[in-house]
Amino acid sequence: MTTAPQPSTWRKIFSRKMLICIFTGFTSGLPLYFLINLIPAWLRSEHVDLKTIGLMALIGLPFTWKFIWSPVIDLVRLPFLGRRRGWMLVTQIGLLLTLLIYAFLNPAQHLYVIMGLSLVVAFFSASQDIVLDAFRREILSDEELGLGNSIHVNAYRIAALVPGSLSLILADLMPWHNVFIITALFMLPGLLMTLFLAKEPDIPPSVSRTFAQTVSDPFSEFFSRKGIKQAILVLLFIFLYKLGDSMATSLATPFYLDMGFSKTDIGLIAKNAG
């Protein structure tokens, strides 16, 4: 009995599914690096103090705590585009619009608005990560998962070059207003992917569950597995383990600026080579 020939690696790489993985990685990485690279550079350029910029690292908490509302996104089906693509579209439109709002803000006058807006961006970005991860897992077979995830992660890293390099270079050439508009428009490829390239996964319906079951059962199981004390320790670890790294990352670009490097220097060297 002969087995069917397997497609070559190159054919797998240049398939529709892997192209989608490029888009999911890029559109997932852009908002995160916008927050941790571009916003601190902008704030320091506008003479915001380092203490405030360091505290801005707390806006990354939605990325750590997204497991809390992920059951809701998994259960609630929006009335357009399907279970996954509907949420993808909502989060991507939300990100595009919120990133554009920065173009009309001034840290000297709207610092607290910027903090609140950054928290909203983090929430939309974390929610997008939830649905993109689920979507990618459902469209990829077990054999395709390794390649698809590696492509996704590499595209995620490439996305860092937009707010972390290109936008910083542009900030030396044009007003921040224009920089934010250009950076926000890089969300459009992911949005177009959702509308025209991605197809809703053909997944058979699972056993019907109530909203309460979907939301409460995972937490009940988590707290009952090894007791409340152990669960709280795990949650504290999740909350704290990235906090120091996040604060250090958010202060890296302001540190370079204070040392006298231009934004072009930082964009070309620290963010590209580093």
Q: Locations of the language-model features?
A:
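Juxtamembrane intracellular "pre-TM" segments in multi-pass secondary transporters
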Residues: 2-14, 201-234
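Helix-loop boundary and gating motifs at the non-cytosolic
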Residues: 5-63, 230-237, 241-255, 259-262, ...
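Glycine-rich segments within core transmembrane alpha-helices of 12-TM secondary carriers
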Residues: 63-66, 146-171
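Transmembrane alpha-helix termini and helix-breaking/packing motifs in multi-pass membrane transporters
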Residues: 71-76, 103-104, 161-181
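A membrane-interface helix-boundary motif in multi-pass transporters
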Residues: 81-88, 112, 169-186
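C-terminal ends and interior cores of transmembrane alpha-helices
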Residues: 88-109
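Symmetry-related core transmembrane helices of the 12-TM Major Facilitator Superfamily/SLC fold
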Residues: 90-97, 177-196
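Cytoplasmic helix-loop-helix junction between adjacent transmembrane helices
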Residues: 120-155
